[in-house]
Amino acid sequence: MSSLKVAVRVRPFNSREIDMDAQLIMEMENKKTRLLKPRLQSIRDAGRDNHHDFTFDYSYWSFDAEDPHFATQEQVYSDLGNDVVDCAYEGYNACVFAYGQTGSGKTFTMMGTPNNPGLIPRICEELFARMRVGQESGTGYRTHASYLEIYNERVKDLLAAQSTGHGLRVREHRSLGPYVENLSQHAVSDFDEIQECIARGNAQRTTASTNMNDTSSRSHAIFTITFVQAVFMNDMPSETVSKIHLVDLAGSERANATGATGQRLKEGAHINKSLVTLGSVISALAEQTGGGHNSSSSALATTPNGASKRVLYIPYRDSILTWLLKDSLGGNSKTIMIAALSPADCNYSETLSTLRYANRAKNIINKPTVNEDTNVKLIRELREEINKLKSMLAGDIHSLQPSLKVLADLQKKEAQEKVLTEEWTEKWKVAQSILQEQKSLGLRKSGVGVVLDSEMPHLIGIHNDVTTGVTLYSLKEGETRIGSEDADVAQDIELAGDGIRAQHCSIFLKGGVVTLHPWPLAQCWVNAHLIDEPKQISQGDIILLGRTNIFRFNNPAEAAKLRKDLSRSQLDMSRLSLITSSKENLLTCSIYSDEDGASPYKRPERQYYPQRPMSRDDPELQDENRKILDTIENALKQLNVERVQMHDQYKTKVRKLTEELIRLEQEEMDGLQLLNCREQELIARKDMLLWEKNNEKVQIDIVCRQISAFQTQLDSKKRDFSEYVAKELQELQDCGKLDEMGMKIEEGTPLNDELLLQVSDSLDLFAAQFIKDTVRRNNEEIRKLDEQIAEKERILNASTTKIAKVDETMLEIQAQLERLRLERAESEAESQAMRAKKQNMKLQLGNKSMSTSTSTNEADDVSKSDTYETCDTFHTAQSNLSLVSSPTITEGQQSPLSNCSCDAEDEAEDTRKDDLSGSSEETSRTCTAGPSSGSGSGSVGIGGSGSAPSCTPSSQAIMSDSGVCLDSRNQAILQNGHLNNYKQAVRTSDEDTGSCSSCELGRHSDVARPYCPLHSLRRKIAAQKALIMKNLETDLNKAQLDEHIADLQDLQRRYIQMEQEMLQSVQDLEAHAQCCADERSGMERQYELASSIMRSSVMSPTSMEESTSQIYSPSMTRSCPSMREFPEGEHFITIPSFVMRGAGKQTHYEYEVRIALPDGKLNILRRYSRFRELHLCMKHCYGAKISALPFPRRELFASNSEPVAKHRRRLLELYLRRLFVVCSKIPQCPIYEGPGGTGLTRASLVQLSSFFKKGLFENGKHGTG
C-alpha cells in the first residue's frame, strides 16, 4: 500500500497578470502552502481567517528567480523524477501527472523547453543512462514508447502518420486493465530515439492561443514507456515489466476568462468535463480511503467490527482520461500528482479549487505490486519448493520410504525448473535478436502495420507479377555489384530476367552520394532515360535494369533534407511530374505487340522499342530515336499550350456567367425588397386606419352612454314637471279655485303646462308669477337636454360614417396587399427557375472545367443563392398569433411617450393605474395562451344589423369641439329604445375587427430595432389623439379642444409628407419597415391593455361577473411578459415571472429579474422585501430624485396571494426601469452614463447595490434569492 504523493509548484506572473497589476497571494514555507484571500474577499469575509493553509509532500516556490528558495527544474526532478526511475527498475508501475488551471505551468513542468527540459525528458535520460550501466553487467533491457492525446474525448496516436485521425478506441482487458486499441508501440534503445518520439508527438499535438495562454494545450497527452528488464541473479532468472505514464493535462478554464468561442469553446467544455471527472474520482477515492480503505468491487464490504459498509462508486469510465489512468489512481501504481498554481489574485478561485483537490488526493491509497513475468514467477516458486524438498530430504535420513518419495519429487521439480529456465533464456535471446534485427533494419510497429525505417540507401523492387512480398536491397558503402548468377565474380545483388547481363552495373556509395555505373551493352534506364555513362541518382528515382526489373531508389538522408527544405509545400510538383512521366513510359512494359498473337505464353518480340535494339553504337538508330523523342516533346508542348488556352477560355466564360448571375440575383433581390417595403407601408397604413376606427368606436361608445344619461335625465325632468303640474292643479281644485273660474277638469284630460298657465291667470299676482317662472324654467331645462341629445346623435352619426369610410379604405389596402403577394410569388417563381438554370449551368461547367478557381467561384455562387433564399423566407414568414382586444388608449393607461413623465406622480394614482393593469395582464395572458374563440370570421359593421342607415351629406353636421360627424337619423333609434342593441353591434364589430388586425400585428416580434425618423412623429400623433379623447370625456372648453385638433391635423400632414419622402428614399425603406413593425407591436400591447379596461366598463352586469371571475380564477404561477416601456433603451429589463417559495408562515413570492447588459445577461430571484430595501437604500443615497419614483405599497392582508403578486410584478418592473433611468443621470452613481461614467455593466450594478449580486448557490429558479 502506498499513498499518492502530492507536490505543488507556483509559477511567476505572466504578461497578462502583469498588465492587470495582479497581486501576490501565495506563500510557502517548507512543506506548508498558504493562500491569502484577495482584498475584496477579505472584506466580505470579515471575522474569518484571511488565508487558507495546506500541507503537501513537496512545495516548490518558482515565483522569483532571484529568491534564494527558488525551485529549479533540477530540484523538481531530483525530488520526483528519481523516484519514478527507481520504481521502474524495481518493477513497479509509475505515473506522474500535472493538474491545474490553464496557463499555470503544467506543460513547462512536464515537458520544459529545449534549454531547460522538464520531468519527462529528464526521466527518459536517466532511464537510459542507468540502462547503459546495467548492460555492461549483463542485464538485458527492452523499451517501447507510445504517445497519445485525448482531444474532445477522442484518442489520437501522436506517433502515427499525420493522416491518422482521432479514432482510436479504448478497451479494457480482464487482467491487464484499460488499453488503447491499435496504438503504435515504438522500440527505443537510447535517449536520442525517445527524444525524437517526444518531439514528433509534440509537433502533432493540438495547441491554440487563448486570452490566458498563448500556447494553451487543448488536449491531454499521455507518454507511456514500457520498460522490461531481465537478468540472472544468483543463478536465478528475473524479468520485470514496468509502465511509466507521464501525463500532461490540459488546464481547466472559464470561457469568460479565456475568451473562448466556437471551436475553442467546445474544446474547453470537453477539457472541463474530463477534469471534473478526474476530480470526482479523486474525491471518491479519498472518501473511500477515509471510510476504511475499502476497495472491494462489491456493493457492500465487511469492516473489522463485522458491520457492512457501502463501497463508493468510482466513476472511472465517465471520461477517457480517468479510464486510462485507472491503475494510476487507486490501483497498481506509484503515483505523483503535481498541482500547478498561479500566484495572482485574479485566479484566486481556480487556485483554491486546485489546492483543495490536491489536498484530497493525499488520502488516495494505491496498491503497487512488482510486475513479474509469469514464467519467472513460476521458476522462482519451483526453486523455493526445491529448496524446501532438499531440506525435508536432509532431515529425514532415518526413514527410507519417505526419502525415496521426496527424492522423486525433488528430481521432478528440478527437471521442470531446468526446462522452464532454458525456455525463458531461449525466449529472451530470441527477443533480443529480433530487437537487434529490427533496429538494424529499421523496423517498427505502427498500430496494425509495420514501418521500415532504414538509415542506409536502398532499392525497393517494383514487380509486375503476382509477387506479394516487398524486396529491399540495401546498398553498402563503396561498390555494390548487380548482375546475374552466371557471373564469374559473385554479385551482391543477383537478378534474373530478360536483358540482365552477367555483370550488369555497379552502384557506388561514397559520402552520401550514390552513382550508377552501367557496364557496356547493359540496358540501364533512370527515369525513362537510357544511360550509358555514370549517373548520380537521387531520392525517388525509378531505375529499370534490363527489361523487367524495376526499382525505386530511396535515400533516407536526402529525403530528410528534402522534407526540411520543402516543409512549406505538401507536394513536390516537379518530382510528381517526373514520376508520372516515368510510369507512363514504364507502362509499355506490359504491352506486348506480338503480331501473330498465337500463344499468350510466347516471349514478346518488342517491349520498349518497335524492334529489338541493335548495338548502341549504331548512329542511324540513335538519330531516329532522338527524332522520335523530339517529336513527342513538341507534341506534348503543343498539347500543353492548347490545354492552357482552353483552361483560360473556360475560366473567362465561367467568370462572365457568374457576374451575370450575380447581377440578376441582385436585381431580383432589389425588386423583392421594394415589394416588401411597399407591403410594410400598406400594413402600417392599415394598422393606423384600424387604430382610428377603434378610436371612433370608443368615442361612439362614450357618446351612447352620454345620450343614455341625458335621456334618463330628460325623462326624470319631464316626470317631475308632470307631477308638479298635477300637484298644483289638484291643490287649486281642492281650494275651489277651478270652480270659481268655471273650469272643470275631466278625468281623461291631460295635465300639461298650458292648462296650468290658464289657471294661473285667475290667481293672485304672486302665485301666478311663481307658477309661470317654474314652468319656464322647466321648459328651458328640457330644451337644453334635447339639444344636447341631438348634438350627441350628430357626433354618433359622423363617427359611424367615418368608420364606414375606414372600412372601405381597409378593403382597398387589403386588395393592394393581395396584388403585392401575387407579384412577390411570381418573382419567387422566376428566381426559382433562375436558380435551377444556374445549377444546371454549374453542372455543365463543372464537368468541363479543370481548375480549382472555377469550383471556388461556383461555391461562392451557391452560398449567395442560399443567403438570398434565407432572406426571402424571412420576409414571407407569418405567425398564427390572434389577439382579441382592440387597440384603444384610455386615461387609465400610459402611452410610451408618457413613461418618463410619470416619475413625479403620487403613489395613490400609480396604484390605481396598476390595479387597472391587473385585469389587462390577465387578458394578455389569456391571449398569449392561444387564439381567441370569440373572434368572428370577418368584420361586421353597424349597418349590418339594419338598425343604422347610412349617413347622407344633407344630414351631416360637424362639431368644432370634437371634429366628428353625427347622423341625425340615429335619434329615432335611441328614442325607440334600441340603444343597447346599437352598443352591442358596435362592440361586436370592434371585437371582430380587432381579431382581424391582430393577425397582421402578430407577425412582428418584440425585438429592439433602430428607429427611423417617422417613429417620434407617429408617437406624437398617438399621444395627441389620446389627449383629445381624454378631453372629450372631461368636457374641456371648446377653444382648447379646437387647438388640440388643429395640432393633430398638422402632425398628420407632416407625417404624410415625411412618409412620401421616405418612399422615395430606398436607403431608408428597410429601417422604416422595421420601425413600423416595432411600433405596431408596442401599440398592440398598449391598445390591448386599454381596450380590455374600456370594454369591462361598458359590459352588462352578467359579463362583468364573468370577467371578474376569470381575472381572479386560479391561473398559472408564471405571468406574461410585460410590455416594453422603454423601446429606445439599450438595456432590456424585465420581470417575466415569479415563483412561490417557503411553506406555512414562511410562504412568499420571489420575482425573476432579467437584465440584458453589454457584457452579458443577469438573472436573479428577489422577494418583495429585497426590492423595498433597495428602494430605501436608494432614497437614502440619492434623496428626492429617488423618492419621487412610485414604489408598490405593502399589503396588510392577502400579501401572499397570486393576484397581489401579479400586481406587484408589473409595478416592480416599472420601478426598476425608472430607477435605472434616474440613476444613469446622477454623476455620483456607479451606473452614470455621462462623461467619465462606466455605464450599466455587471460590475457597476454590483457596486450600485448588493441587490444585483448573485449568491454562491444562485444559479436559476431553484437557487436562493
UniProtKB/Swiss-Prot annotation:
Primary location: other
Any one biological process term the GO annotation gives: plus-end-directed endosome transport along mitotic spindle midzone microtubule
Disulfide bond residue pairs: none
CDD domains in the cross-refs: FHA_KIF16 (cd22708), KISc_KIF1A_KIF1B (cd01365), PX_KIF16B_SNX23 (cd06874)
Pfam families named among the record's database cross-references: FHA, Kinesin, PX
Location in the cell: Early endosome
Stretches the record annotates as Disordered: 597-621, 828-864, 884-954
Biased composition (Gly residues): 933-946
Biased amino acid composition, Polar residues: 846-857, 884-901, 917-927
Keyword Membrane set for record: no
A GO molecular function held by the record: ATP binding
PX domain residues: 1129-1259
GO cellular component: cytoplasm; early endosome; kinesin complex; microtubule
Keywords linked to the UniProt accession: ATP-binding, Autophagy, Coiled coil, Endosome, Microtubule, Motor protein, Nucleotide-binding, Transport
Stated role: Plus end-directed motor protein involved in asymmetric cell division of sensory organ precursor (SOP) cells by playing a role in the asymmetric localization of Sara-expressing endosomes to the pIIa daughter cell but not to the pIIb cell. Targets Sara-expressing endosomes to the central spindle which is symmetrically arranged in early cell division.
Protein name: Kinesin-like protein Klp98A
Annotated gene: Klp98A
